[in-house]
């Protein structure tokens, strides 16, 4: 058994005569611990963003309300999928996912939104900023996963980055008008 940085034990399929070494394609314990720590932060970021997107979905106002209301729903559905996938990856690695608002707020780099009357332009700009933050953070984790030989985490994050990249581009084009 090895330990993730959250103190939780996980079973490693790697066997090696050398301490700290792992089988080809299987990350070592230190790499797994670092990946787990990043994934825990991603779960927290996505948890906070999920609530934030609902706030915008419910409280935006402006001329394009219906279209943006539906777009925000698409975003929180997408965030839900990423949130669940990352949490399940943590479990596969033997770690526990944060699962409370207190944990999310303590770990997340995304700030809560408390404003209740939000213009469409303001909401979309804030969503774009949060997506850019996520893209940067996920890119860092992807490098760590790739360098560690964790192809599963690398693949999961590649899919998330693809979705984020398209959303950032589309939000940028929308806000340019």
Curated annotation (Swiss-Prot):
InterPro entries: DPS_DNA-bd (IPR002177), DPS_DNA-bd_CS (IPR023188), Ferritin-like (IPR012347), Ferritin-like_SF (IPR009078), Ferritin_DPS_dom (IPR008331). Pfam families: Ferritin. GO terms for molecular function: ferric iron binding; oxidoreductase activity, acting on metal ions. Belongs to the Dps family. Homodecamer. PANTHER family: GENERAL STRESS PROTEIN 20U. This is Antigen TyF1.
């Amino acid at each position: 058994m090895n330990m993730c940085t959250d103190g939780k034990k996980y079973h490693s399929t790697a066997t090696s005569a050398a301490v700290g070494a792992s089988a080809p394609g299987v990350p070592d314990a230190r790499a797994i611990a670092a990946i787990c720590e990043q994934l825990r932060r991603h779960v927290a970021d996505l948890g906070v963003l999920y609530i934030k997107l609902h706030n915008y979905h419910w409280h935006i106002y402006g001329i394009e309300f219906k279209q943006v209301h539906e777009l925000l729903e698409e975003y929180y559905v997408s965030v839900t999928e990423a949130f669940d996938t990352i949490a399940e990856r943590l479990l596969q690695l033997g770690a526990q996912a944060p699962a409370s608002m207190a944990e999310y707020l303590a770990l997340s780099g995304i700030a809560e939104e408390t404003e209740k009357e939000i213009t469409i332009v303001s909401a979309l700009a804030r969503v774009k900023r949060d997506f850019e933050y996520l893209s940067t953070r996920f890119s860092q984790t992807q490098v760590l996963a790739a360098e560690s030989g964790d192809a599963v985490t690398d693949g999961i994050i590649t899919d998330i980055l693809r979705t984020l990249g398209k959303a950032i581009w589309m939000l940028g084009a929308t806000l340019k008008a």
